Amino acid sequence: ADRELKEMLLKKYSGCLSRLRSEFLKKRKKGKLPKDARSALMDWWNTHYRWPYPTEEDKVRLAAATGLDPKQINNWFINQRKRHWKPS
């Protein structure tokens, strides 16, 4: 009886389930950057604290060093300045 119920439910809802599954897979998981990447970005941040605006060259170098893409580098600096920078 359980098997019949399971088959009936699968038949009825398999379309919905596969749509949901693909939707979940599309949503990127939000997470922290890798620890070594964060520490490389923090090193740059700490040595440039008075003016923490990396040039495009800096961003390319940081991307190469951390394995992050330039957009991630950019977003990290935007967030970091917004959360932790008090211009003097």
UniProtKB/Swiss-Prot annotation:
Against PANTHER family, the record matches this protein to: HOMEOBOX PROTEIN TRANSCRIPTION FACTORS
Instruction: Name the source organism.
Output: Zea mays
The UniProt keywords, alphabetically, are: DNA-binding, Homeobox, Nucleus
Q: Which function does this protein serve?
A: Probably binds to the DNA sequence 5'-TGAC-3'.
**Gene3D superfamilies per record:** Homeodomain-like (1.10.10.60)
Its name, as the record gives it, is Homeobox protein knotted-1-like 11
Q: Give the family per the record.
A: Belongs to the TALE/KNOX homeobox family.
* DNA-binding residues (ranges): 25-88
Q: Which InterPro entries match?
A: ELK_dom, HD, Homeobox_CS, Homeodomain-like_sf, KN_HD, TALE_homeobox
Main location, first listed in the record = nucleus
Its subcellular locations are: Nucleus
Q: One GO CC term of this entry?
A: nucleus
User: Among its keywords, does the record have DNA-binding?
Assistant: yes
Pfam family name, one: Homeobox_KN
* GO molecular function annotations of the record: DNA binding; DNA-binding transcription factor activity, RNA polymerase II-specific
Q: Does the record bear Amino-acid biosynthesis in its keywords?
A: no
Residue intervals of the ELK domain = 4-24
